[in-house]
Structure formats: structure tokens, C-alpha cells
Amino acid sequence: MKIKFLFILAFGLLAVLSAASQTVAYSLNDTPLFTVRMPDGWMFESRPNPRNPASKRISGTASKGLVWFGVWVVKDVKTVDEAYKYVQTTAKTLITDAKETKAPYNGEVNGMKAKYSEHTGTMKMQDGKSQVFDAQVVLFETGSGRVGIAVCMADTEGLKVEKANIEAFFKSIKPIK
């Protein structure tokens, strides 16, 4: 009886865990580079990157609050430090008052060399209204001579209600070996 109960309990937990998120693989030129787990309720799509149509960008929105996220490969860079220059340039292009809120620091994500940074600024929305965003950026060396970027931009409310999912999103980035 106990074994049957434990089996049902374990099966139920597995069903809940598998329904709670979806792992997505990022590939470039048909070569898988890394995976990232999208939390339950986050809507996402894969499309050509507007700044580099030869690569794709997986992006979307969270289910609660104003939260946008994206992952892609930074064009023509081989290190996180080179990619960081790209972040600074791109941030100033999209968000004219962009500023760092926390000094960038080096670390790792699941065995990959990484650089973390946090920013804030005002961005025009599609409806023309201005919106203040906080952005978290993780640059990571995929081990294939490419650097991936994961970005999450959110308003204050989005940061509060999606905090755990945002943290899980960044921690889930893994190389494909």
C-alpha cells in the first residue's frame, strides 16, 4: 500500500514539474548552443533577430506584470567582455537615458563564463507612451566560440510578481555539449 502511494505521489510530482516549465534549445546554423527553461505562463516565440537576421532571437513576455525577456547570440564577438560593449551600445540606442544600476561583475552560469549587469532607463512602448524599465543582463560564453545574451526587462510591478521566475530563467541557461 505504501509503495503504491509513493508511486502515485512521485508520478504526480513529475506531472506537476513537467507542466511548470518548458526547456527550449537555441541553435545557430543548425548547431545547438544552449538551452533555457521558460517558466509556466511565459509566452515566447523564435524569430530572426532584428539586429542580426542571420541569427534568431527567442523572446516574449511573462504572464504577470510588464516583463519582456530575450535570448540570442551576440554577433561577431568571442568573449563576454566584447559582448558587454555591445550591450552598452545597444542599450543607449534603445534607451537614451540608460544607466547601470549595479557595477557589472564576472561569474559563471552552469559552468559557462558569464558577465552580469543591471540597468535602468525609459523606453518608448509601441503605443508611444514612455515606460521606466529595469533590465538584468547575463552574457555567457557558450563554449563554441559564441557568446549568448539573456535579457529581462521589467517594470517595478513585473519585477515583484515575476521575481522567482526571472531568477529561475537566468539560472536555467545551460550549454549543450
Q: Where are the regions that the model predicts?
A:
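Secretory pathway targeting signatures of secreted, lumenal, and periplasmic proteins
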Residues: 35-85
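Signature of long, low-cysteine stretches enriched in small and polar/charged residues
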Residues: 88-141
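Stable alpha-helical elements in mature extracytoplasmic
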Residues: 34, 38, 82-90, 162-169
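Short, solvent-exposed aromatic-acidic interface loops
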Residues: 74-76, 90, 152-158
